[in-house]
Amino acid sequence: MLPSYVLITPARDEAQFIELTIKSVVAQTVRPVKWVIVSDGSTDGTDEIVIKYAAERSWIELLRMPERPERHFAGKAHAFNAGYARVKELQYEVIGSLDGDLSFDENYFSFLLGKLVEDPELGLVGTPFANSSNKTYDFRVVGLDHVSGACQLFRRECFEEIGGYTPVKLGGVDYIALITARMKGWKTRTFTEKACLHHREMGTAEHGKLHASFRNGVKDYAFGGHPLWEMFRVIYHMKGRPLGGLFLGAGYVWAAVRRVERPIPREIVAFRRREQMQRLGKIVRGGLSKVFGAGLKQADSSSVENPQLRRGEGVLKASPAKNFPKS
């Protein structure tokens, strides 16, 4: 028997895509006990779309949050935590964070729940994502123990042990949760047999991409990234996007010179650096030529052993079913 689960979706101005996400969840063979969609000051019609579906399904709830005067990347954690307050007293065994711009097949969550049943040491699971350009993480580099923040499914004990999502203005709250889970002895794993489609294209303008690269460099320093690992990341990015790699390195150096405050405990920094050096050692021993090719975070999806990603089939077509049950 599969464990029961709840979902929380922080959403801000997701009217363009959130209906695809709702239809994907409604079509699941195993539905959540509760799904709280937290509208974080949305003004584009997101709320009205959610209300339409929630009116016929008691397990879907819209939670509206007022618009905050200060906008930063901690907003996702604040919105998630508001939703968490609505479900934490319920009976469930798994809790998931789900972005509001995804679509996936009807067995997506039953598949992940099954993986948690198979291995009691797994605390966090997920799948790869791809966007319309068929790009995803290069797991030859980041490793299959990395779980994208687009959809993270936690065993309840794991989520409570790590203290949930900690708001950090620089962002990366899902990454902090991932590292903390491993530090506390839980396994984390991405399973490439399935995938989800990430509909929103991030940083489509070149200046947006460069700004994101610089910010990622700042975040790498703030989260205690080892200088040698960062050097590898910069070189790796430059193979696909030279300017992106340069801006990544510039962000790291800028943060180091400015001594940007590190918002995570020292033990997490130390643990993260040990992991990075272990991974870098494996990459070097395995041959650098095997992993150099595409960008670190936007590698061609052929690096993932998933025929859906390689051929652009199935879930990547984002073809939601036409009829969905109302219960």
Residue ranges and their predicted role:
Residues 39-48, 102:
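A conserved acidic beta->alpha catalytic loop
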